[in-house]
Amino acid sequence: MTNSVYFQLDSVESLIDELPYMYYLGLFFVNVLILYYAFLMEYIVLNVGIVFLPEDMDQALVDLGVLSDPASIPYDTDTELDVFEGYLE
C-alpha cells in the first residue's frame, strides 16, 4: 500500500522536475512587472493625484453647482436633533 503512494508521489515530482528553467524565469519577470505597476499606481495616486485636488472642497463643490454656497446659509443643528427625539425618549 505504501509503495503505491510513493510511486504516485515520485511521478508527480518527476513532472515538476521536467519544467524548463525558462518557465521559472518567466514567472519571476511577471512578478517583477506586477510589483512595478503596483508601486507606479501607488506613486501616481499619492503624489500626482494630490496636485489636482482643490484646497477648499466646499468651494469646489459650489463651483460645480453640486452644493449651494456654504457661507450664504447658516448651518442649523436643531434639525438633526429633531430626527432623534423619538429614539431618545
UniProtKB/Swiss-Prot annotation:
Pfam families from the UniProt entry: Dexa_ind (PF15198)
Similarity remark: Belongs to the DEXI family.
Query: Using the chain's own numbering, where are the disulfide bonds?
Result: none
- Protein name, please? Dexamethasone-induced protein homolog
Question: Which species is this UniProt entry from?
Answer: Danio rerio
